[in-house]
Design a protein with these regions (language model features):
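Active-site metal-binding loops of divalent metal-dependent hydrolases
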Residues: 38-39, 81-83, 131, 155, ...
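Metallo-beta-lactamase
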Residues: 20-21, 101-118, 122, 152-208, ...
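Core dinuclear metal-dependent hydrolase active-site scaffold
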Residues: 35, 66-71, 77, 184-233, ...
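Basic, amphipathic N-terminal segments that precede the first structured/catalytic domain
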Residues: 2-63, 196-199
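Feature marks short, surface-exposed loop/turn motifs that line or immediately flank catalytic pockets
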Residues: 42, 85-87, 157, 251-253, ...
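Active-site metal-binding motif and surrounding structural segment of the metallo-beta-lactamase
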Residues: 93-150
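Cap/insert and terminal regions of metallo-dependent hydrolase folds
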Residues: 98-111, 221-304
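Conserved beta-strand hairpin/beta-sheet module of binuclear metal-dependent hydrolase folds
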Residues: 31, 40-111, 220-247
Length: 304
């Protein structure tokens, strides 16, 4: 479909914003990804710990991260939202005990974006990788202000699974997701189960279905230039430079290095497939970085 030297350019014609795809060098403007640590939680990081005697002794403090992607064509993309400033008022008692959330003034996604000179109205898309409360808690700060709120897990949420009813706080997202932004997965050659969706339809931001942690969880691949990865991944290491927001498909590098399943998953076998897929992606010579929702990083920003 596109060659490796294809680039995206934004243009306005007769009042309509469009993306022009043309041959040339890679995007001259850099793509920037910022990690926004929006507080912490205290949980069991590995699935094996949950099944041991006295598992609470293994609980550790982990960051709760959201991510800002500043894209030269598609603008500002916020991936997940982290804790809200009033998280302890939002969570029911049993979830407060489960997560033990902590957040200090200035740590919310909204406040960190303000420090960068961005308002909620400046966010073009809010992407929710799944519907757990540590990812949706601060969605209210962007609802009605960000141009789009996109989530794919809704088709799984409306299922008989009781875990959805006790683990996810409906009021943090149900009022804010419009019907037209309920994205459905489609077939692709990329991912542990071969499903995903192309967010903008131009191969720049791919949401790859990685079930296991929840039934509808996805990771986000940001491509430097069109790669046609959804169609030709089976041909080998194809395309251009990319970065990955792994969300909760893996909590940290340890999951990838040792093929350890993260804690609190819906399906351990699918979790392991998703972890192995991420490990393979990270080996690619085109991979510029991989970031996790619950892992600290020496880098808070990446340009590529």
């Amino acid at each position: 479909m596109y060659g490796r030297n294809t680039i995206f350019r934004k243009a306005t014609i007769e009042g309509y914003n469009i993306v022009i795809v043309q041959e040339g060098d890679c995007i001259s403007e850099e793509i920037k990804i910022s990690i926004l640590q929006c507080g912490t939680m205290t949980v069991l990081p590995y699935e094996a710990d949950i099944r041991r005697n006295n598992p609470l002794e293994k609980r550790i403090v982990l960051p709760v991260n959201a991510f800002l992607v500043e894209h030269p064509v598609h603008g500002n993309i916020l991936i997940d939202t982290g804790w809200a400033s009033n998280v302890n008022d939002i969570l029911p008692k049993y979830l407060k005990h489960f997560y033990r959330p902590q957040i200090t003034p200035g740590q919310t996604a909204k406040e960190q974006l303000a420090a960068k000179g961005l308002r909620p109205e400046d966010i073009d898309v809010v992407l929710l990788t799944h519907l757990d409360i540590d990812h949706t808690c601060a969605l209210k700060d962007f609802a009605g202000k960000a141009k789009r709120i996109v989530c794919a897990e809704l088709e799984y949420f409306y299922s008989p699974r009781y875990v959805y009813k006790i683990r996810q706080v409906w009021d943090t997202w149900i009022p804010y997701i419009k019907t037209e932004d309920r994205i459905h997965y489609r077939s692709s050659t990329l991912g542990p189960v071969g499903r995903g969706f192309d967010l903008f339809g131009d191969d720049s931001v791919l949401c790859i279905y990685t079930p296991g942690h929840t039934d509808g969880n996805f990771i986000v691949m940001i491509n430097k230039s069109p790669s046609d990865r959804f169609k030709h991944h089976g041909d080998g290491d194809v395309g251009s430079s990319f970065a990955v927001i792994a969300g909760d498909a893996a909590f940290s590098e340890t999951n990838l290095n040792e093929h350890i399943v993260p804690g609190y998953g819906f399906n351990r076998k699918l979790q392991l497939k998703s972890v192995e897929f991420l490990a393979d992606l990270r080996k690619s010579s085109y991979c510029c970085g991989m970031f996790f929702s619950h892992s600290s990083s020496d880098r808070t920003e990446i340009f590529f």
